[in-house]
Amino acid sequence: MVTIRADEISNIIRERIEQYNREVKIVNTGTVLQVGDGIARIYGLDEVMAGELVEFEEGTIGIALNLESNNVGVVLMGDGLMIQEGSSVKATGKIAQIPVSEAYLGRVINALAKPIDGRGAISSSESRLIESPAPGIISRRSVYEPLQTGLIAIDSMIPIGRGQRELIIGDRQTGKTAVATDTILNQQGQNVICVYVAIGQKASSVAQVVNALQERGAMEYTIVVAETADSPATLQYLAPYTGAALAEYFMYRERHTLIIYDDLSKQAQAYRQMSLLLRRPPGREAYPGDVFYLHSRLLERAAKPSSSLGEGSMTALPIVETQSGDVSAYIPTNVISITDGQIFLSADLFNAGIRPAINVGISVSRVGSAAQIKAMKQVAGKLKLELAQFAELEAFAQFASDLDKATQNQLARGQRLRELLKQSQAAPFTVAEQIMTIYTGTNGYLDSLEIGQVRKFLVELRTYLKTSKTQFQEIISSTKTFTEEAEALLKEAIQEQMERFLLQEQV
């Protein structure tokens, strides 16, 4: 039989008393009054702050958005099917943040930065707040480096610089996503990290974009943040901020980043849904009063920081969908006023076979030629002028029966210039190829060809330049200038190729 010694027992009790640590935990709790439609009304939570995360009994997380006198309105970050009336809720004392790391490159994640591509967990040791303040005036510098999209129409006439916000706007099915994905493809080898945020889209459309990027090796430097049409409104509203937090992580590590929000109309609709369910007063088009702030605080995070913050940048290409070309609706006008210019895609041009369907007349870049290399400035000025004159003449020519020779020549030149702006999807051009194409058109070398021959000739000329006149590409990439030597090489190549092309066509 085991003997119990009194001194041992007293020692154990003494040790326990010494180790005892009296800890008082004050937890701010509340009770669910009502739940439904992704919204919960909570009684209690007296100390909760606006934007604070709250945790429900069964594990769902929500954000406290409405702080009222007798209850708190919480939006749920999940379906909330297991939340019951009367269950308890506790405030976490935190605001929404996500883990960030290099390991996110090449992955598809949701608005909470959790992987949804079935390739396992993502390891990260750091985290960033989803909503963080944009750089102030002093911590920015003006945009001066070009961000090449690979599309002639944009890089020559509506140039985008690193740190700029350029809106892509147009009706549905006009190629807005195609312009954005082509820009991602063109960043290959440019040391630019791309973030593509899909908001409220069909899962099949997102899968299509991911496959296109994977096939061309672009996923290596891209992160896809996706919240599809069946996601809760809260997550669709948060997705762009998650993308911005990831892009900022790289920007403050002196990397250049490009972020695409596809599209902000859907985010505004998700926010409208949340606001109406929270019984916030509706304004124009039933959007809440702070819908401008929703987009401005997101887009202001794109910047070219001053050299004291490193040499990184964050360029934003937000996409907005219009209804039958109406750019004067609420969300389009808001985003136009926030961004540094817009690329307007026209359904009429798209249906007429002009793709990318960019309406050069009303598209604008407020950064302008500061975001172009000298070589592009040298050749692009003439293109802009001639296309503007052509658009005016074309409208006039519809009513005039007999036109003089000079007008006919100008119309013929304009048609050929419009032809050289056409590009296949996922076929971006290098700067040297763009300069060659524009120079050939604006200097009248295409005037002798039929309109149907223009694209074929340009394809062959590009191939010929690549193989036989490699110095041309070298001069442009090393000096960034369209030198006399480069011009002489180009003229020679055009003449040689034109002779060969015309002989082929005669056969």
UniProtKB/Swiss-Prot annotation:
Residue numbers binding ATP: G170, D171, R172, Q173, T174, G175, K176, T177
Name the GO cellular-component terms. Answer: chloroplast thylakoid membrane; proton-transporting ATP synthase complex; stromule
* Membrane topology category: Peripheral membrane protein
Q: Name one GO molecular function term.
A: ADP binding
- Cross-referenced Gene3D superfamilies, in alphabetical order? 2.40.30.20, ATP synthase alpha/beta chain, C-terminal domain, P-loop containing nucleotide triphosphate hydrolases
Q: In which compartments does the protein localize? A: Plastid, Chloroplast thylakoid membrane
The subunit structure is: F-type ATPases have 2 components, CF(1) - the catalytic core - and CF(0) - the membrane proton channel. CF(1) has five subunits: alpha(3), beta(3), gamma(1), delta(1), epsilon(1). CF(0) has four main subunits: a, b, b' and c.
Q: What's this protein's function?
A: Produces ATP from ADP in the presence of a proton gradient across the membrane. The alpha chain is a regulatory subunit.
> Mind telling me what this protein is named?
ATP synthase subunit alpha, chloroplastic
Q: Which organism is it from?
A: Populus trichocarpa (Western balsam poplar)
